Amino acid sequence: MSLLEVRDLSVSFGARQVVDKVSFSLDAGEKLALVGESASGKTVTALSTLRLIENARLTGEILFNGKQVLKMLPEELCELRGRDIAVIFQEPMTALNPIYAVGDQIVESIELHTKLRGAQAWAEAVGAMRRVGIDDTERRARSYPHQLSGGQRQRAMIAMALACNPKLLIADEPTTALDAAIRLQVLELLEDLRAQAGMALLLITHDLNLVRRFADRVAVMERGVMVEQGPTAQVIEHPRHPYTQKLVNSRPVRDVGPPGAGRVVEARDVRVEYPTRLPGIRGWFMSGRFTAVEGVDFDLAPGETLGIIGESGSGKTTLALAVLGLMEAQGEIRIGGSSWRVSAKEKRMLRREIQVVFQDPLSSLSPRLTVEAIIGEGLEIHAPELNAADRRKRIVQALYDVGLTEAGEAEPLLARYPHEFSGGQRQRIAIARALIVKPKVVVLDEPTSALDVTIQKQVLELLAGLQRKYGLSYILVTHDIDVVRAMAHRVMVMKDSRIVESGALEQILVNSRSDYTRKLVEAGVA
């Protein structure tokens, strides 16, 4: 008998059906990956096994250890959740309660599902955190979620999920919010803990590289329908369904032209420091200094892409903000030969030369502004001489350049708001906003990490085409080695605020001299 068996599961919200007659099974100790893009129904399917989907109508059968989950009473469901089946959510910062210490949140689960209380429950919680590799465990257990790094928060959530030794662990995109090296550590940790406890794992993901390495079987979902399932090697190496084939073939393809001569960005001995609060009574009277970037030098040529890689906290995003003139820095940074140490008026003119595309377009685009207002905002600042007709013409051309519309068909889009577009379309709007002022340099801060794999490929192809068309230079900040391979001419590796090594793409990714770089590359292809 299977540990979990789902038969003809359908889920609907009112008249809208989001999962349609899905069937699969999972044996004790087995690893099954549910794969699909956003809105494929994979998360709804997995969370339905615990009846965690509110205001939904569920039909079909869900059996756990032979018991009908859809017929369980509330007290039976309470025992099932956390004790027999546990969940790790995608973003630990939103899943953990910000007003309670991490250890207290783990204690709550232990006291709910076991007979341990007080000091015994606390000791068990600290032990669970120690087992998942959190160092300085007693202090971390008394810390609040915001005081931990992303990797530590995810480990704390894993500790909470595994504290009561569940038979099944549901991991919903458990590493999407983490950088490559931490992602590999967390996945290897999950695999070790799963093997030790003989636990089954239901992995929800859109990352086929992850599936290749960690799943025994894979089930592919598209628009609420399970289109294909089977052993991992069979499904990925010989996909039968067109949708599975599209997912497998969505890996970015390298398509870059040669860079030009000269320099559009020059950085010399760049140093960025933050004030930090000192511990104890000293913190009342003085502050310390934290160095986020130390002694960084680099150049960027016209039409060139420089990939900056490194773990969270390595200083790569801080360096990008300094280059953008958004953070005070020591040393020398020149954009097109001009320094940021100029008057406010000259600084405004310089900002036209360098623009940025952020990681998550939903949070970087104002929900109160229309597409026309979002894209045209830069023109109001940098080209105030344009009349309304000319400004709209430039906006329409920008939409056409990023592939959101055919010529002459932009009018219906201009009055719409960001929430009315898909994730990929929103990122195209963000790119159009950056390009509307005709910059020489664009900083790309994790430009595809919030997108599905097929949309990632489309956006990367768009960026490559725009680079060839306009001679753009890119500073690409990312932890995705596949994206670096597809876009970068040169790579710079950062660790603990410093450059570990830099050079041509092949030199760094294939013939690296640094153990740290090799670890990043290995994690990126995991």
Regions found by a protein language model. Give the residues of each.
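ABC ATPase NBD Q-loop/coupling interface
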Residues: 61-79, 117, 188, 279, ...
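A short, proline-enriched helix->beta-strand linker immediately N-terminal to the Walker B motif
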Residues: 163-167, 436-440
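A short, surface-exposed alpha-helical micro-motif characterized by mixed small hydrophobic
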Residues: 211-213, 484-486
